[in-house]
Design a protein with these regions (language model features):
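Helix-termination/interfacial motifs at the ends of transmembrane alpha-helices
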Residues: 28-107
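Large intracellular
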Residues: 1-39, 111-154
């Protein structure tokens, strides 16, 4: 069951008018967006932090390399540490965390659109519009392929 829809329907059953319904539900959508943005920001922090950690590793590798310039055999392994930590930082940021941020943004946008569609349906109910009119209005927000499936279900 969709709690957002249930809450809106309960408000209508309890006698809330359209204006009160819209105000309350839009407030819920805004709160949800703020929560999502906060979570996206936390993961974005890791996207920004990973290359910095890679650079710290690079500096450590360079310090090790420069500290042992007298021993030619130690230069290679120290240089490898320097280069690998840069690679690890870029890999973690771009291959692990960036896709997570992208998915979080996509899911958030999807949920906002979904809730706005639910709100439009609830507004139609509050205005006592015909069920067919509400159905047509909501179907118009769908891609054409899904619209045809929606009409068959009617």
């Amino acid at each position: 069951p969709d709690k957002f829809f249930e809450k809106g329907m309960q408000m209508l059953v309890d006698g809330a008018d359209e204006q009160k319904l819209v105000k309350q539900m839009k407030s819920e959508i805004a709160s949800m967006k703020a929560r999502h943005e906060s979570q996206q920001g936390a993961v974005q922090g890791w996207v920004n932090l990973a290359p910095a950690m890679g650079m710290i590793g690079t500096l450590i590798g360079l310090v090790l390399m420069l500290g042992n310039m007298g021993d030619p055999k130690s230069i290679g392994p120290a240089m490898a540490v320097a280069l690998l930590t840069t690679l690890y930082g870029a890999f973690v940021a771009n291959v692990m965390f960036m896709p997570i941020v992208g998915k979080l943004e996509y899911y958030s946008a999807y949920e906002v659109v979904y809730r706005e569609m639910v709100l439009e349906g609830l507004r139609g109910i509050a205005r006592s519009e015909s069920p067919r009119n509400i159905q047509d209005q909501m179907a118009s927000a769908l891609p054409p392929k899904l619209q045809s499936k929606f009409e068959v279900a009617a």
